Amino acid sequence: MFVGEYYHSLDEKGRLIIPNDFRQLLGETFYLTRGFERCLNIYTITDWNNFSQIISSFSPTDNLMRKLCRFWFSGSIQVTTDKLGRILIPSFLIEYAELSKEVVIIGAGKHIEIWAKEKWEEFNKEENILENMNEINSKVAELWKK
C-alpha cells in the first residue's frame, strides 16, 4: 500500500522525483494518468491493467463508460524512472493537473496521487473528512462485514 505525503519540486523540464518508498513498490516502469480531482495518478502496471480490463468490459453502447474509457486511455502513459528516480511528466498532464514548481505526492492506498501544492491545500480545506466521518464509518463498517 502507498502511504505518506511528500513535498517535491517539478523541474523546468517537467521531471519529478518519485519518493524512494514508492519506487520500491512500483518498480522502474508504471502508469501515469489523469486523476478524477485534477490531480495525476500513478498505478503499478498490474493495477492499471486490472482497472483497464474492468472498464473495457462494459458495453460499447454505454455512453458514460465510453466517456470514462476516453478519459482513462487518452490520459495515460507508461513511464520509467531515470537513474535519479525521476519521471518526465508530459506537458498535457502538467496542464491538466495545473502543476507548477511545488507539488505534493501522496500515497492513496493502491495508487499514488500527484497534486499541485495549492490544489492539495485547497482540497483538504474543502473536503474536511472529519465533517463526513459518520458516513465514512458506515461505509467502512459495511466493508468489514464482507
Curated annotation (Swiss-Prot):
GO terms for biological process: negative regulation of DNA-templated transcription initiation. Pfam families: MraZ. The keyword DNA-binding applies. GO terms for molecular function: DNA-binding transcription factor activity; transcription cis-regulatory region binding. Keywords: Cytoplasm, DNA-binding, Repeat, Transcription, Transcription regulation. PROSITE patterns: SPOVT_ABRB (PS51740). Residues 5-47, 76-119 form the SpoVT-AbrB domain. Coiled coil: none annotated. InterPro entries: MraZ (IPR003444), MraZ_C (IPR035644), MraZ_dom (IPR020603), MraZ_N (IPR035642), MraZ_sf (IPR038619), SpoVT-AbrB_dom (IPR007159), SpoVT-AbrB_sf (IPR037914). It comes from the Bacteria. One of its GO terms (cellular component) is cytoplasm. It is found in: Cytoplasm, Nucleoid. PANTHER family: TRANSCRIPTIONAL REGULATOR MRAZ. Forms oligomers. Belongs to the MraZ family. HAMAP family: MraZ. This is Transcriptional regulator MraZ. It comes from Dictyoglomus thermophilum (strain ATCC 35947 / DSM 3960 / H-6-12). The lineage of its organism: Bacteria, Pseudomonadati, Dictyoglomota, Dictyoglomia, Dictyoglomales. The gene is mraZ.
